[in-house]
C-alpha cells in the first residue's frame, strides 16, 4: 500500500529546484493548472506547488496549496517519477477539492500515457 504522507524528500523546497523548470521542462496545460514536468536523476517523485498573487490573497493561495497537497497525498500512484511543479492559474480559487481532483487526475492520466 502506498504511504499517504508527504515527506520532505518528496517536496520541491528551494528556489533552484523551481528554477530548473525554466529550461527543458515538459508542459501540460489544463483550464486552471499548468503542470511542469522534468525528469530527475532517479530521486523518485518530487512535487512543488506554485500559486501566485494573481490567483488571490494569502488565505486563498494557502487554501489552494492545501488542496493540491491533499490531492498529491491521496493520488501518489498517478504521479510518474520526475520533478513536478503544479502552477495554479487565475480562476483556480473557485474550485473545490473534487473539481481539482478531477482536472488533475485527467492531466496526470495524459502524462502517464505520454511517458509510459
Swiss-Prot record:
Enzyme class: hydrolase
Pfam families: Ribonuclease_P (PF00825)
InterPro entries assigned to the protein according to its UniProt record, in alphabetical order: Ribosomal_Su5_D2-typ_SF (IPR020568), Ribsml_uS5_D2-typ_fold_subgr (IPR014721), RNase_P (IPR000100)
Superkingdom to which the source organism belongs: Bacteria
Keywords per UniProt: Endonuclease, Hydrolase, Nuclease, RNA-binding, tRNA processing
GO cellular component: ribonuclease P complex
Enzyme nomenclature, EC number: 3.1.26.5
Catalysed reactions, semicolon-separated: Endonucleolytic cleavage of RNA, removing 5'-extranucleotides from tRNA precursor
Gene Ontology MF terms: 3'-tRNA processing endoribonuclease activity; ribonuclease P activity; tRNA binding
Family in the record: Belongs to the RnpA family.
Function: RNaseP catalyzes the removal of the 5'-leader sequence from pre-tRNA to produce the mature 5'-terminus. It can also cleave other RNA substrates such as 4.5S RNA. The protein component plays an auxiliary but essential role in vivo by binding to the 5'-leader sequence and broadening the substrate specificity of the ribozyme.
Record HAMAP family: RNase_P
Subunit and partners: Consists of a catalytic RNA component (M1 or rnpB) and a protein subunit.
UniProt protein name: Ribonuclease P protein component
Organism: Citrifermentans bemidjiense (strain ATCC BAA-1014 / DSM 16622 / JCM 12645 / Bem) (Geobacter bemidjiensis)
Gene designation per UniProt: rnpA
Amino acid at each position: 500500500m502506498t504511504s499517504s504522507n508527504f515527506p520532505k524528500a518528496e517536496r520541491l523546497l528551494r528556489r533552484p529546484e523551481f528554477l530548473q523548470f525554466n529550461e527543458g521542462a515538459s508542459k501540460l496545460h489544463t483550464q486552471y493548472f499548468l503542470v511542469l514536468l522534468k525528469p530527475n536523476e532517479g530521486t523518485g517523485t518530487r512535487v512543488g506547488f506554485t500559486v501566485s498573487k494573481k490567483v488571490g490573497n494569502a488565505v486563498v493561495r494557502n487554501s489552494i496549496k492545501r488542496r493540491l497537497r491533499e490531492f498529491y497525498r491521496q493520488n501518489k500512484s498517478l504521479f510518474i517519477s520526475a520533478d513536478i511543479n503544479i502552477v495554479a492559474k487565475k480562476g483556480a480559487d473557485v474550485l473545490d477539492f473534487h473539481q481539482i481532483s478531477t482536472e488533475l487526475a485527467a492531466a496526470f492520466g495524459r502524462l502517464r500515457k505520454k511517458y509510459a
